[in-house]
Each structure stands twice: as C-alpha cells, then as structure tokens.
Amino acid sequence: MVHPFLFLEFLRKMLAPLHLSEASADAVSYTWLIIALLLLLSFLATRALKTVPGGLQNFMEIIVGGIENMVTETMGEHGRPYFPLVATIGIFVLVSNLIGLIPGFFPPTANINTTAACAIVVFLSTHVVGIKRHGIGYIKHFCGPILWLTPIMFFIEVIGHLSRPVSLTLRLFGNMNGHELVLIIFFGLAPFLVPLPMMLMGVLVSFIQAFVFMLLTMIYIQGSLEEAH
C-alpha cells in the first residue's frame, strides 16, 4: 500500500521510463535508500575502530554480535561462514520493515517483489551450499531412506523445497502489507495519537518478521549441510 505522500516522490518520476507500477517504483526507491543508509552506517561505524567501542561502533557491534551468536547457537560453529548472508538479509529486512513506520515512507517489504527477491536469494543459497558441501550426493536429500519410495519421495521433497520461497515471500509480504493497510485506515479514521499503539505493535511485528526470516534462512541452510539419511 502506497502512502499518500512519499519522501522519495521525485524518484518515482525518475523511474518512469522503466514503466514500473507506482508501488514497484516506490519499493525500488526505498530499497536503494535503505542500501545507501546501511552502507553509510557501516562506513561511519568502521572508519575509526577502537579497542573499547563507543557510540555507533558499540551499537553496531551489539547488533552484529547478537546475530553471530544466534547463528552459532542455531547452526553450530560450522555455520559461521554463512553469518554474512544471514546478517545481511536479517538487517535489510528489519530496516525495510521499520522504515515504513516513519510517516511518508514506504516499507519495501510491503511489496511482494522485494520479499520474493529475498526469498529467492535464500532458496538459491540453500541449494548452492548443499551442492558445494555434498556434490552430486546432494540429490540424496530428495530421495528418502527407502529405495522403492524414491520416485514418490523425490516429488514430495521437490514440492516441499519449492514451497519454501513461496512461504517466505507471502509471510513477510502479508504481514507488512496488512500492517500498512491497518495504519492507513486508522490514520484516516482517527486523530493522530489514536493509531500510536498500532505503530508500537508495528515495531514488534517488524522485529518478529525479521527474526523469523533469519531463523528460517538458518534452518534451510543447516538442512542442506546435513548428511542425507
């Protein structure tokens, strides 16, 4: 759902030659804005690293350290190589969710194209990791433990794996787009202060959805690393 007044309205006009819908143009604009903000924050936090961190460096270390601990607790030590992927997706989804709470801003995750792109990255990464780890033996993950049931199990497993990006896409999109709709309705029907509790709930929803997306990413990658039985 598009806000009546958009902070990056001018970018919609710049993207007009691409013949994107208004919602897609807004999602692209705010996606690039979020990428720029995250790059700027990373630069500012790391340009003068200190042994005893403070300010922005301390804040970023808390976030990165928390995600790293979550990765190692969920996947074990062998999950560390995949920490950058999990952290990048998690932080991007979280900031994309939260930015929609600012009046005039649009959350890219309320557009199905953005959530689908994130889900496809997770889907492809999962299978690339599995093939890299097991080689041709990765196919055993789809065959099941009983040889004569292999054709049936293969079909079921393929459907199950294909449903993963669909569920990731629709879960995040549905929650964030639904929240946008509710906020717009409340702001249209009630004074400014009345919708504030809904905005506070939006903060909680934003964190939960980012956490769920990261958790499922780790579970899927962990599954591809395990030996087939």
UniProtKB/Swiss-Prot annotation:
Alphabetized InterPro entries for the sequence: ATP_syn_F0_a_bact/chloroplast, ATP_synth_F0_asu, ATP_synth_F0_asu_AS, F0_ATP_A_sf
Assembly behavior: F-type ATPases have 2 components, CF(1) - the catalytic core - and CF(0) - the membrane proton channel. CF(1) has five subunits: alpha(3), beta(3), gamma(1), delta(1), epsilon(1). CF(0) has three main subunits: a(1), b(2) and c(9-12). The alpha and beta chains form an alternating ring which encloses part of the gamma chain. CF(1) is attached to CF(0) by a central stalk formed by the gamma and epsilon chains, while a peripheral stalk is formed by the delta and b chains.
Membrane-protein topology: Multi-pass membrane protein
Domain of life where this protein originates: Bacteria
Family designation: Belongs to the ATPase A chain family.
Alphabetized HAMAP family for the sequence: ATP_synth_a_bact
Any one annotated GO CC term: proton-transporting ATP synthase complex
Annotated PANTHER family: ATP SYNTHASE SUBUNIT A, CHLOROPLASTIC (PTHR42823:SF3)
Protein's UniProt keywords contain Flavoprotein: no
Protein's job: Key component of the proton channel; it plays a direct role in the translocation of protons across the membrane.
Transmembrane segments: 25-45, 86-106, 111-131, 142-162, 181-201, 202-222
Protein name as catalogued: ATP synthase subunit a 3
SUPFAM superfamilies cross-referenced by the UniProt entry: F1F0 ATP synthase subunit A
A GO term for molecular function: proton-transporting ATP synthase activity, rotational mechanism
A Pfam cross-reference name: ATP-synt_A
UniProt entry keywords in alphabetical sequence: ATP synthesis, Cell inner membrane, Cell membrane, CF(0), Hydrogen ion transport, Ion transport, Membrane, Transmembrane, Transmembrane helix, Transport
Major localization class: membrane
Localization in the cell: Cell inner membrane
Record GO biological process: proton motive force-driven plasma membrane ATP synthesis
Encoding gene per record: atpB3
